[in-house]
């Protein structure tokens, strides 16, 4: 427990300490955010705010882990997944900055790159970490075995595709208001810190805890009005840690509950697109759903805090489901 707290504290301290200098560095090189014209009008004043803040979070994470983490396959596996997802996000951010446009990588190309991350995660999980090809469903006494040999590996790979690509994209969609994705991600990762600790996966608990510390440090600058945005670098990194934590703790089926807010945000976009294509009408004033509430007149801070409360409720429910259906049954 001491190592978890120490890692989080170091990550927080380093992120806060380096924040101002990193923001000035981004401003000097004009690495600013380009805001979509079709977005809320209140967001137009955010144009030019430094982006790629996920790099700052990762510096805090690395610093925290350098102090307390132990080198082993589990640690390296999680860090490789995080580095790979963050790398895709960084490339996307760079495309936006270099092209001076709010659109980065195409959805198809980003999916392809994240699919390659899944292949990497698949190899690390099955070959080096020893993750089994079974799925634990809360409330059921028997595990769901995906199948023997090649069939099992194939089905497990499909599951990992849904977990990693789905989670990273859902967190990315949530990153639309100052502090929203960071705060919600921190809450979900705090839950996984506790789960990993109870599972005696202490190295994973240290990584999740350090990421929470880095996120809190990032919120020092990302809270409204934000001085820096995390960009895809940060949102995909958070999604990467969440995905890895779910896979290693065998709580893939609980991830949609623990990260419930991200699911709601992603569903709001899918519902909006499908209904509009079928009926030419919109369910929400604007998607993702946090912009809908902005259009209703809610202040940005109010939307963010209320969504944090919703995410806290989901994470608490997910932890209780884990504790009573999975942990207590062992």
Curated annotation (Swiss-Prot):
One GO MF term: UDP-N-acetylmuramoyl-L-alanyl-D-glutamyl-meso-2,6-diaminopimelyl-D-alanyl-D-alanine:undecaprenyl-phosphate transferase activity
Keyword Coiled coil carried by entry: no
Chief place where the protein resides: membrane
Functional pathway: Cell wall biogenesis; peptidoglycan biosynthesis
The reaction(s) this protein catalyses: UDP-N-acetyl-alpha-D-muramoyl-L-alanyl-gamma-D-glutamyl-meso-2,6-diaminopimeloyl-D-alanyl-D-alanine + di-trans,octa-cis-undecaprenyl phosphate = di-trans,octa-cis-undecaprenyl diphospho-N-acetyl-alpha-D-muramoyl-L-alanyl-D-glutamyl-meso-2,6-diaminopimeloyl-D-alanyl-D-alanine + UMP
Source domain of life: Bacteria
GO biological process: cell division; cell wall organization; peptidoglycan biosynthetic process; regulation of cell shape
Name listed for the protein in its UniProt record: Phospho-N-acetylmuramoyl-pentapeptide-transferase
Cofactor(s) listed: Mg(2+)
Mode of membrane association: Multi-pass membrane protein
Record-listed E.C. numbers: 2.7.8.13
Functional note: Catalyzes the initial step of the lipid cycle reactions in the biosynthesis of the cell wall peptidoglycan: transfers peptidoglycan precursor phospho-MurNAc-pentapeptide from UDP-MurNAc-pentapeptide onto the lipid carrier undecaprenyl phosphate, yielding undecaprenyl-pyrophosphoryl-MurNAc-pentapeptide, known as lipid I.
Family the UniProt entry places it in: Belongs to the glycosyltransferase 4 family. MraY subfamily.
EC class name: transferase
Assigned GO CC terms: plasma membrane
Localization (cell): Cell membrane
Source organism of the structure: Rubrobacter xylanophilus (strain DSM 9941 / JCM 11954 / NBRC 16129 / PRD-1)
Transmembrane segments: 3-23, 49-69, 71-91, 111-131, 145-165, 179-199, 204-224, 228-248, 256-276, 307-327
Keywords: Cell cycle, Cell division, Cell membrane, Cell shape, Cell wall biogenesis/degradation, Magnesium, Membrane, Metal-binding, Peptidoglycan synthesis, Transferase, Transmembrane, Transmembrane helix
Stored NCBIfam families: mraY
Pfam family of the protein (one): Glycos_transf_4
């Amino acid at each position: 427990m001491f190592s978890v707290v120490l890692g989080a504290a170091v990550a927080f301290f380093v992120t806060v300490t380096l924040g101002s200098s990193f923001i000035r560095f981004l401003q000097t090189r004009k690495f600013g955010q380009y805001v979509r014209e079709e977005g809320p009008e209140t967001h137009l004043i955010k144009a030019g705010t430094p982006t790629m803040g996920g790099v700052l979070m990762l510096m805090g994470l690395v610093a925290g882990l350098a102090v307390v983490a132990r080198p082993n396959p589990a640690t390296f596996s999680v860090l490789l997944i995080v580095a790979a997802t963050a790398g895709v996000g960084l490339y996307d951010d760079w495309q936006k900055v270099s092209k001076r446009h709010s659109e980065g990588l195409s959805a198809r190309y980003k999916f392809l790159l994240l699919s390659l991350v899944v292949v990497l995660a698949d190899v690390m999980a099955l070959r080096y970490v020893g993750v089994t090809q079974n799925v634990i469903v809360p409330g059921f006494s028997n595990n769901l075995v995906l199948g023997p040999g090649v069939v099992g590996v194939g089905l497990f790979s499909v599951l990992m595709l849904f977990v990693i690509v789905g989670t990273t994209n859902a967190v990315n969609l949530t990153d639309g208001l100052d502090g929203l994705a960071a705060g919600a991600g921190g809450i979900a990762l705090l839950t996984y810190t506790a789960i990993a600790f109870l599972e005696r996966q202490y190295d994973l608990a240290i990584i999740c805890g350090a990421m929470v510390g880095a996120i809190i440090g990032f919120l020092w600058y990302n809270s409204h009005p934000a001085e820096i945005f995390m960009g895809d670098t940060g949102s995909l990194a958070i999604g990467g840690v969440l995905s890895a934590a779910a896979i290693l703790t065998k709580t893939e089926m609980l991830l949609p509950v623990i990260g419930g807010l991200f699911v709601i945000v992603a569903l709001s976009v899918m519902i909006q697109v499908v209904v509009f294509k079928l009926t030419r009408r919109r369910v929400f004033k604007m998607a993702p759903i946090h912009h809908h509430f902005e259009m209703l007149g809610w202040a940005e801070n109010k939307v963010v805090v209320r969504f944090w409360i919703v995410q806290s409720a989901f994470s608490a429910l997910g932890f209780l489901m884990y504790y009573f259906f999975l942990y207590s049954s062992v």
